[in-house]
């Protein structure tokens, strides 16, 4: 009787662990699959933070991200239905064994602001991510130890069909969202959102408190100082960084600032309060932007001029790259400079087109390929 009860307990633990893992892996894989460019940017952040960006070819972050999201989603589906139980539980344990110490390092040293494990759908701090991964690691151990006890919801004869359909679905989803735009937009710039409202601080909300830290050098020794203990002029300035002292409320949109290139004027408020239509061509790195739809872009600009609408190209690229773009494309539209991360967040396309009116986003379209641009 005791042996039977112990077996039942082990089976219950294994299956509870299996469903916890399945939910986490399905959600994590799905939200990254619908936003392959967003996951690419996160992988690029990781590689840059660890000084490994030059180790891999340029296509690695994108294709690697698509592959990893497909693996996560497939593991989750397999665990949920009891398909490929040994393979799924082993891969889950391997992934969690790797990710748990990695996220501990991220939590301690903070080389990236967040791990990106759930994309933009659910942003966790690095410490929250580590705690989550510890729990998932325990679940992975439980599912792996009891892998033979995982209840099947699909017969062994049908395992190949579930496996094939799962992989087909997740890869098709990723490449569709890459060709178009994410079918689910978890960012503050999705269609229907008002940018100005997203920048507004609620009444009574306490803002975050930051402190400037100055790195100075004297006699070959580097030290960090604040404004309160800033030393005399015998120290040489090396670098500066901003440190978060006290976390407060942070608006969903906090780095949206349009600086017109020709005048250096901040035109953000003028654009966001304009009651007419405004076209925003978003190209976070103009030198890397796809130019296959240049004729369409110029047609939209001509249309906006003809009807009295505003048209701006937003980029983080330096002026010399903008001039090269003008020479190559014949662009006559005005340019504004903006933060690179903000531009990547606005639209998952380089370039992409956004239509706003009175600060409200009316439409967005991808300009990487003719399919989306022509339809919109």
Roles of regions detected by a PLM:
Residues 11-34, 58-102, 143:
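Functionalized membrane-embedded alpha-helices
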Residues 369-375:
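Conserved small/polar residues in nucleotide/adenosyl-binding loops
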Residues 173-267:
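Membrane-interface segments at or immediately adjacent to transmembrane helices
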Residues 155-182:
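Internal/C-terminal transmembrane anchor helices
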Residues 271-288:
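Short active-site neighborhood of thiol/selenol oxidoreductases, capturing the structured segment around
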Residues 97-150:
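Membrane-embedded alpha-helical segments of integral membrane proteins
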Residues 351-364:
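A short, hydrophobic beta-strand/beta-hairpin element that forms part of a small beta-sheet core
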Residues 26, 311-314, 328-350:
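Short, internal strand/loop/helix patches
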């Amino acid at each position: 009787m005791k042996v039977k009860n112990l077996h039942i307990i082990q089976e219950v633990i294994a299956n509870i662990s299996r469903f916890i893992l399945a939910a986490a892996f399905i959600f994590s894989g799905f939200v990254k699959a619908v936003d392959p460019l967003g996951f690419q940017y996160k992988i690029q952040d990781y590689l840059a933070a660890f000084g490994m960006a030059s180790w891999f070819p340029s296509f690695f972050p994108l294709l690697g991200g698509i592959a990893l999201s497909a693996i996560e989603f497939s593991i989750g589906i397999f665990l949920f239905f009891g398909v490929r139980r040994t393979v799924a539980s082993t891969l889950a344990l391997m992934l969690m064994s790797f990710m748990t110490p990695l996220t501990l390092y991220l939590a301690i040293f903070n080389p990236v602001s967040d791990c990106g494990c759930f994309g933009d759908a659910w942003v966790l701090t690095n410490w929250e991510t580590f705690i989550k991964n510890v729990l998932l690691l325990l679940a992975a151990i439980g599912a792996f130890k009891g892998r033979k006890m995982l209840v099947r919801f699909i017969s062994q004869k049908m395992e190949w069909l579930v496996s094939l359909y799962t992989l087909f679905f997740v890869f098709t989803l990723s490449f569709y969202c890459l060709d178009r735009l994410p079918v689910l937009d978890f960012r503050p710039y999705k269609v229907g959102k008002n940018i100005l409202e997203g920048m507004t601080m609620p009444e009574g909300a306490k803002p975050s408190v930051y402190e400037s830290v100055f790195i100075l050098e004297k006699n070959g020794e580097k030290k960090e100082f604040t404004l309160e203990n800033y030393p005399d002029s015998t120290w040489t300035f090396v670098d500066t960084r901003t440190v978060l002292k006290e976390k407060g409320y942070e608006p969903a949109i906090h780095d949206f600032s349009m600086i017109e290139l020709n005048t250096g004027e901040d035109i953000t408020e003028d654009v966001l309060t304009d009651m007419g239509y405004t076209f925003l061509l978003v190209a976070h790195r103009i030198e890397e932007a796809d130019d296959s739809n240049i004729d369409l872009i110029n047609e939209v600009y001509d249309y906006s001029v003809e009807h009295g609408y505003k048209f701006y190209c937003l980029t983080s690229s330096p002026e010399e790259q903008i001039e090269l773009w003008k020479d190559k494309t014949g662009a006559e539209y005005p340019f504004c400079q903006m933060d690179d991360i903000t531009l990547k967040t606005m639209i998952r396309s380089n370039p992409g087109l956004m239509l706003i009116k009175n600060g409200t986003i009316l439409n967005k379209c991808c300009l990487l390929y003719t399919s989306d641009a022509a339809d919109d």
